[in-house]
Amino acid sequence: MPQTMEKSVQKENRKDTNMAGNNLTQFMDRVKAKNPSETEFHQAVYEVLSSVMPFIEKNPKYQKAKILERIVEPERVLMFRVPWVDDKGEVQVNRGFRIEMNSAIGPYKGGLRFHPSVNLGILKFLAFEQIF
């Protein structure tokens, strides 16, 4: 490949990478605004999108279909209380969750979680990771 053509290709590749980086930053800003205080979920989304954003940028049909917007938004989030009696006879109340992320290829994966240490961000992260 002639040197001038090679430089042109390298410049174009850098431009594509920068454009994807800008779009990734903008997309992540929107995800964070819709899902504040869910840092585990933000991290999972960033890791996946940093890999797929260049492909999405080169295939506008996926942008038009809003594929990224669809995969980061759960279809359903169920939040419920779980009252129970501990070994001392004391009533305890925990919050339970079920995140149903995407049913495009069949039933939802995952289960119910109601441990006191979990929160919505952790469970959205787990559900998001299971759709790939």
Describe each PLM feature range.
Residues T4-V9, N18-F132:
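N-terminal ligand-binding/catalytic initiation module
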